[in-house]
Swiss-Prot record:
GO CC list: cytoplasm
Binding-site positions, Zn(2+): 74, 78, 188, 196
Record-linked PROSITE patterns: SIS
HAMAP family (UniProt xref): GmhA
Stored Gene3D superfamilies: Glucose-6-phosphate isomerase like protein, domain 1
UniProt xrefs under SUPFAM superfamilies: SIS domain
Name the record gives this protein: Phosphoheptose isomerase
Protein source organism: Chlorobaculum tepidum (strain ATCC 49652 / DSM 12025 / NBRC 103806 / TLS) (Chlorobium tepidum)
Entry annotated with the keyword Cytoplasm: yes
Function text: Catalyzes the isomerization of sedoheptulose 7-phosphate in D-glycero-D-manno-heptose 7-phosphate.
Length: 209
């Protein structure tokens, strides 16, 4: 049920705000559609790589900063706990590198923040594992360095990026780049949508659907 505004006409900007809601949400939907149509094959390939890694006893590491750190943690939880209550399966090993406050602050203090995810990848990553880097700009130094290190260590690398992919894209075996610049919000919305689809695909590929 739609509630009517009781203020004098126009004083609360109701119609203007409703137009903003439509503009933002419809643009977000169009952006997701653009990514889906352009990169559906890449998304399927990412899911296949992750499923193969889990089957072989490997794990997934994820890293990002700010909202991307939250997205990394969100997706790790979907793997380790569950995605949908209708699917019953074992836990799948995924670790968000942005969740340990002591490790993050010690690394930032002793090594510099750009080296934090490198150090954690060194601690937890093994050849054959996967590191997923999330960066709305495609240029986050800490994520870039972690992906560079991961490749040298023998990990596979995936990335969810924005803009033109930035400096990180060449260091990812597979990357989904959201074609948006100027703000992180719409990119993050696409990243979490892509991540959810990947988790669902992994479950299906592993026979848990």
């Amino acid at each position: 049920m739609t509630q009517q505004c009781n203020c004098s006409e126009g004083s609360c900007g109701g119609t203007r705000y409703e137009e903003l809601v439509l503009e933002r949400m419809l643009y977000s939907a169009r952006l997701k559609e653009s990514v889906a149509r352009r990169d559906s094959d890449v998304i399927v390939a990412m899911a296949s790589m992750i499923a193969d890694t889990f089957r072989e006893g490997g794990k997934v590491l994820l890293c990002g900063n700010g909202g991307s750190a939250a997205d990394a943690q969100h997706l790790a939880a979907e793997f380790t706990i569950r995605y949908r209550s209708s699917v019953h399966r074992p836990a799948l090993p995924a670790i968000a590198l942005s969740t340990d406050t002591s490790a993050l602050t010690a690394g930032a203090n002793d090594l510099g923040f750009d080296e934090v995810f490198v150090r954690l990848t060194e601690a937890y990553g093994c050849p054959g594992d996967i590191l997923i880097g999330l960066s709305t700009s495609g240029n986050s130094a800490s994520v870039l360095k972690a992906l560079e290190f991961a490749r040298k260590r023998g990990l596979k690398t995936l990335a969810l990026l924005g803009g033109d992919g930035g400096a990180i894209k060449p260091h990812a075996d597979l990357a989904v780049v959201v074609p948006h610049t100027g703000s992180a919000d719409r990119i993050q919305e696409c990243h979490i949508a892509v991540g959810h689809v990947i988790v669902e695909l992994v479950e299906k590929m592993m026979g848990y659907d």
